[in-house]
From Swiss-Prot:
Protein name: Nucleoprotein
Residue spans of biased composition, Basic and acidic residues class: 180-192, 247-258, 368-384
PROSITE patterns xref list: COV_N_CTD, COV_N_NTD
Residues covered by region (Disordered): 1-31, 44-84, 164-196, 238-258, 326-409
Function: Packages the positive strand viral genome RNA into a helical ribonucleocapsid (RNP) and plays a fundamental role during virion assembly through its interactions with the viral genome and membrane protein M. Plays an important role in enhancing the efficiency of subgenomic viral RNA transcription as well as viral replication.
Region called Dimerization, residue ranges: 226-333
PTM comment text: ADP-ribosylated. The ADP-ribosylation is retained in the virion during infection. Phosphorylated on serine and threonine residues.
SUPFAM superfamilies (UniProt xref): Coronavirus RNA-binding domain, Nucleocapsid protein dimerization domain
Pfam families per record: CoV_nucleocap
Gene Ontology cellular-component terms listed: host cell endoplasmic reticulum-Golgi intermediate compartment; host cell Golgi apparatus; ribonucleoprotein complex; viral nucleocapsid
Start-end of Basic residues biased regions: 70-84, 358-367
Amino acid sequence: MASGKAAGKTDAPTPVIKLGGPKPPKVGSSGNVSWFQAIKAKKLNSPPPKFEGSGVPDNENLKPSQQHGYWRRQARFKPGKGGRKPVPDAWYFYYTGTGPAANLNWGDSQDGIVWVAGKGADTKFRSNQGTRDSDKFDQYPLRFSDGGPDGNFRWDFIPLNRGRSGRSTAASSAASSRAPSREVSRGRRSGSEDDLIARAARIIQDQQKKGSRITKAKADEMAHRRYCKRTIPPNYKVDQVFGPRTKGKEGNFGDDKMNEEGIKDGRVTAMLNLVPSSHACLFGSRVTPRLQPDGLHLKFEFTTVVPRDDPQFDNYVKICDQCVDGVGTRPKDDEPRPKSRSSSRPATRGNSPAPRQQRPKKEKKPKKQDDEVDKALTSDEERNNAQLEFDDEPKVINWGDSALGENEL
């Protein structure tokens, strides 16, 4: 499949990928946990959350009059040396009349409860949405169309197309976010460091580990099927599958680092979310057929628009600057660094430091067995922690409502 920028102006509207994801089911459930993922305090003893908007997670299945409920504090603990240790609280959303505080009316005062309601909500209505059965349904990603919680809270990135086997995927993608501003109320801005972008590759890698194994025969088939249907298997270089990288013509995407690492390079994972699907490419492109001596050549010209107010706009621009016509180059921070020396003079017998005296080794105390540590948690705490599916500290980008966060891989 050929691709490229439009050669000239056209009256046809520019094709744009419509981003979307799964939503909570319309019918209630007999479970006992929240439909949505938690928001988590960044520090211990943080005050209750305040929301820039209504505080009600987006759910198009409910009428505006039904968009109200409460956020409930969930104390969290983790096992450690000497017993359990508290970690920052998590807050879960439940619709009015459901969940642990189902007996409360909207607005009733209770410690650890924050009531929220959307515009036009009828707070006298008690929801029949029910709660989630964790054996049948995964947590649903949080989206706040009118603004999320204040900067004291974060939530983890959940791939919108993950299955039951993908729970640990989101754990590796937990991310901190800055306090939201008016310009970015629909998303969460974060730094653009390359090491954060690189970790995005774990999304695909974890899914591969949890899913079916790719045999050598399968990998070879993936790399050598019809050119327009090829995908890069793990441990393959880009040029092994799609040929050498070039400049100014087809095959011009990817620098030397991306070529060597293949799908392990997190920039691949990010940019795949801007690539059109097969249907979008066929029906949203300008298609140009040409008969050539060797056969029929089809050229697909498609434009994906990343808005300037997208939380990851700067990251995408940076990746394009690095990788378009990037053959023969590497990211600046990927260049090998010279080894530093404490002195410019070569070491001689006269100025060499005296050998250090070896200290006697201390006997290591035997570590507690895992089963002994786990006993530090009560059964109630273990059950509560079972709901906390994504607990890693924020180490990577929270893509939020950005092009990456909304498009299926």
